[in-house]
Amino acid sequence: PVGNGSPGANGDNGSSPVDGQVVRVTGIVTAILKKGFYIQTPDDQADKDPKTSEGIYVFGENSVGMVSAGDLVQVDGTVTEFRPRTERIFLSITEITKPTVKVISKSNPLPAPIALTSTDLDPKGKLDQMERFEGMRVTGDFVAVGPTGGVTNEKTGFSGSNGVFFAVLQGTPRPVREPGLGI
């Protein structure tokens, strides 16, 4: 997002260099969830630094009802590194909390998704190698390889996803584990 928080709001590694600071960012709403929404820098304003993300999550239930996908918004709030669950192995998610949101314009085109390739996903890469895509629209030729954290009701036949799933790019050799002993 453009502003005094970008590219610094997300930074170029696993945590934000402005964690705990109040920032002002501007971006296009790309997705709306129950407790917040994602914004991303318009394509023509992206910083072109391949190590930094152009997107960020805005956490705040009260602001969800006032935005729509495609809105250009200005957000003032505190940058926070949120770690889902209590397990230390999960990476933190950079988000803006306690937001004040102002809609600048509506019906803007969404930023183009970044096409992920096998060069973006190095099995021997750093744990935070995907940080540069955090909060951004991405696409790829993916194959799901693991279950979601959603819900399944066998009695009614309903299943729902929480949006979290495990996937690999099509053509990835042995996508579930690293090469080892032949079985």
Identify what each model region corresponds to:
Residues P1-I183:
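Extended non-catalytic accessory segments flanking core domains
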